[in-house]
Amino acid sequence: MDDLLLLSEAQMRRIEPYFPLSHGVARVDDRRVLSGILFVIRNGLRWRDAPAAYGPPKTIYNRFIGWSRLGVFNRIFAELAGGSDTSDRLMIDATHLKAHRTAASLLKKGLLPRCIGRSRGGLTTKLHAVCDGSGRPIRLVLTEGQTSDYKGAAMLVDTLPPAKAMLADRGYDADWFRKALAERGIAPCIPSKINRKVQISHDRTLYRQRHRIENMFARLKDWRRIHTWYDRCAHTFLSAIAFAASFIFWLNQ
């Protein structure tokens, strides 16, 4: 059992203010349950297979679903990542995440979008992210797998914090995006598309740092329930991503 994940007391102190208070019968220790949630997400387990050390699997699952619906994990991520809103450079990119057949069922429940679409990789979801200069995610959004990069950028551009430069690949080379960045005082470091009539130069030395956002996606995808998602609700999946990102990039700082 030495490989079990357990949040430290210091980590719990940083996130416990975001959870609703317990009323009535004392509930299973939050630290154990949250550690169990992270363990399931990291190892790609079914909820019923969560180790007994974390408490009853049903409790772990119900707590995750309930807190997801309340937006708890998204708030934790937003608050922890908000401390990086003074970065001098930002990076934006997107990656495909495979949808398991249990998530890709044609049966649609609820009013929220499923965020599952068909791309060259099959049924996928696309995760769009903005990172700070250290490669730590500060903004996350999900769309259908076939959504273009610049449409994802349109969903994120109004939320960008102040910065000096934005690093992005040529998939983001659109006049409207460059203009939106300039209006915010952010210099675009984006290679021009091949078919652009007048090529726009960019800082090649600075652009080499863009690998950090690729590394961020790689670290997230090491967590099996993020690499492939099984939940039928997009907001539940985004909660899993937000909590994993909070733990990997912010709670371990």
Task: Locate each region found by the language model.
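Short alpha-helical elements
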Residues: 1-253
